[in-house]
Amino acid sequence: MKYLSPLSLSDTQLNITELKQQLTLFSQYQINAFHQHKAVSDLVLERSHYFDQLLSRLWQFFKFDDIANTSLIAVGGYGRSELHPLSDIDILILTENNTNDAFCQKVGELVTLLWDLKLEVGHSVRSIAECIEIGQNDLTVATNLQEARYISGNKELSHQLKLKIHSDSFWPSELFYQAKIDEQKKRHSRYHDTTYNLEPDIKSSPGGLRDIHTLSWIARRHFGATSLLEMSQAGFLTDAEYRELLECQEFLWRVRFALHIELKRYDNRLTFGHQASVAEHLGFIGEGNRGVERMMKEFYRTLRRVAELNSMLLKIFDQAILHQGEQDDAIIIDDDFQRRGRLIEARKPALFQARPDTILDMFLLMANDSTIDGVAPPTMRQLRTARRRLNRFLCEIPEAKEKFLQLTQHPNALNNAFSSMHKLGVLSAYLPQWSHIVGQMQFDLFHAYTVDEHSIRLLKHINKFSDTTNRDKHPICCEIFPKIMKKELLIIAAIFHDIAKGRGGDHSELGAVDAYDFCISHGLSKPEANLVSWLVKSHLLMSVTAQRRDIYDPDVITEFAKQVRDEERLDYLVCLTVADICATNPDLWNSWKRSLIADLYNATQRALRRGLENPPDLRDRIRHNQQMASAQLRSEGFTQWEVDALWRRFKADYFLRHTHKQIAWHASHLLRHQDKEKSLILISKNASRGGTEIFVYSKDQPHLFATVAAELDRRSITIYDAQVMSSKDGYALDTFMVLDQNDDPIDEERQQRLIDQLYDVKLNDQATHIKTRRPPRQLQHFNVKTRMEFLPTKTGKRTLMEFVALDTPGLLATVGATFAQLGINLHAAKITTIGERAEDLFILTSDVGGRLDDEKQAELELALVKNVARLSS
């Protein structure tokens, strides 16, 4: 059944039931046309025309034509004739001297009918004078009025409004331009000034549709151009720029149209929950998340193109509107470039096409002169043209290679040159591999940025290591980085560390090959190329070891040190690792990770200096810890006899797994603890190893770990590390290293409350029912398969279990309860959250104290998969 033109509907058909049916038929027709690849520009215009007809027919039905001096006008996006399935329909009822009760009732009936039809209608009833007065004081109203379009009623009244709106007295173009620039800056800052947000807003994100609208609004206000085509015809856009903006708009419109098909309520955010379905609507298919990643790659690339054009054209408008007839004097830099104000400018119109290597010269000059903070619009245009006409990558030009290497060696290049090269598409023009990662995203909660944006942020974080004001946040890197002799090797490794992502296979291995070839082709020595290649191949090694291995086990340190080999490689690796973590997600780096990386670095440095053939004597370590702790305890008034009597209850492992300060702290409170049968819970007053330490002493119970983990989870406290051990006489000596929901140590005010809450929990309860928090909204859109891998330890007496699952609230408590149900002993836990994934390490033994046999491993795997599935259901 085909929809009818609203103009053809009789008065009897203008009822809720019939109109709803007609709207449904029209919407379904548009959805079908969209899936049959009808141009989305035609669809949004067609939708606008349909509602023009519907409103005109209703205007006639309610007899507004009988009222003099009244006009129905579309404003805002509807005024531009751009309507998507869930777009607001903004209308202005323009009237003069018609505000009596009968008129107001008629307006109310019209609007109520539209609302009953479930249409998102925004309406206002104003005179011309009211429009002008309100518009002069409200930029949004002024912008909407600028796009006013006549629909029905008194045409002359609509024309009079347009004359008033487009007069200079309404909004002088200089003020309008500045107001729109300020508005865009504020909008961009809400999205962290990047086109790469995990759940971007199609309309408002930098590079989104609003950036195109801003260009149109300014051009309309100052130049009288009512469309991109008119801007091109007036010479403010080149034909190529016009076609590119049109192409970008068409793609963004298709994404928005597809999103609106999926939604029930108006929204322009491309959330995780809708990315897959939108990708399917647009024909992006692939195994797993490949379809989503392909669509988002095109989406981010489109935002980049819009953002680049927006930046360049606004600079042109700035000159034409604010500085017409004015121009800063040119300060000649060399034969090819000059500085005009704070912008660098090519002195010859076809410089980049004639000598493409001079593109790199421009960025070297920007690095040399901190007063230059951008590229002049004509030079940006020249660069864009030259970039598209290159018949080979810049890295194939010998002169360009030399200049690129100079940039990696320049102390100021990290600060702005590389990010500017990326924004202006020069890194893609230089490196073929870089062009493949532009806009490359990963469908997860861990990586906050696309691969290219992450790599640029990594370079900026490396630059922070040379600033002593960052010493508190990055003590080791700020100490090491200034001493690294060949910083360019670290820079090249940073550029290449993720460059092979999206190709399939191990990106570290593939990137290492690319990095080696790059170094050799750029004249670096083989030892230098080998170092860079090793850094790329091993860029995850330190992070994984610190977060997912027991770095207080000498065997782990020895194995890590063997892979690193020498202190020079260790210094390069720690700088790359820390910058990589910081650039992955702004919330990832915290005091706990800083402590882990520092402990691993220091332990490895000691091992390398001692020599790997001379491992530490564990008995010496136990003696050292006991002697230092004894001295502290004696200074507090305890006798050596009291201390020795307590420690005789503890196993040797306790003195290896804790520092002498922890041992003294535990003993000091245990010796004062009179009732041996009663539990004791301690919380460190000061942050230890980057987190808050919770110590639990209690009669040992199988479910103790699970009970404590469940209670901490309910309080939004995250366990990062746990040491689970017992005394010889059957008492638990469990240590939990925790952070709050903001990844900060627990503040003192909350510590006593937390102790009371833990005491209130019956520590001998069997945690069969685990109360959990509501999972975050985004988790429901991810499916992480629960899996585990069992690894033998060096001695063969314990089992290491690597565990991966969706990071659902209550997960750790569920795992602990499963261990208890199966009679499996937990000795230590390393907890790592990578976005939506939990990647944890557990050290386990059987109920009789040995490693888990194959049968027990299979039983545990089956139980964990079942229990975790129940938790997520």
Swiss-Prot record:
UniProt activity-regulation remark: Uridylyltransferase (UTase) activity is inhibited by glutamine, while glutamine activates uridylyl-removing (UR) activity.
Cited CDD domains: ACT_ACR-UUR-like_2, ACT_UUR-like_1, HDc, NT_GlnE_GlnD_like
UniProt cross-references to Pfam families, sorted A to Z: ACT, GlnD_UR_UTase, HD, NTP_transf_2
Cofactor(s) demanded: Mg(2+)
Boundaries of every ACT domain copy: 693-777, 800-873
Protein family (similarity comment): Belongs to the GlnD family.
Protein name: Bifunctional uridylyltransferase/uridylyl-removing enzyme
Originating organism: Aliivibrio fischeri (strain ATCC 700601 / ES114)
Gene: glnD
